[in-house]
Amino acid sequence: MMCGIVDLGSNTIRLSIYQYEGEHFRLLLNKKTMAGLAGYVQDGALSDGGILVACRVLSSYRALLSNFSVSEMHVFATASLRNISNTGEAVEAIRDVTGVTVEVLDVETEAALSFKGAVLPGGVPTGLLADIGGGSVELVSYRDM
């Protein structure tokens, strides 16, 4: 099966397409669009222009996924939508325009998923993981993995 994962970040919106079978997965495509959503924040709120940029990118990713015959698309937002005053309105507007539901991750979930994604491929038993995004930084110290 194939699945599209979208990371709706403060500066970039990234699409990754994976082929997976059970616990095994393989990256087929990684596309990044410089959207600069952080630049559309005015008085703590994402402007209509910023929402429109997000909608355009998500719509183009949805079309790309249909070319790959991928029907499953999961969209996650981090600080880009978490740290604005109109999170609910932005998520609703994106859904209304694109039909895409955006899940806004809290800081703890973002850090846990970043950690899981970072240690899965390499199996490093002890370390410090730094996830540096456009609008947030998560640090995770771990040992005996």
Question: Can you say where each PLM-predicted feature lies in the sequence?
Answer:
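Active-site-adjacent helix-turn-beta-strand microarchitecture at beta-sheet edges
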Residues: 135-136
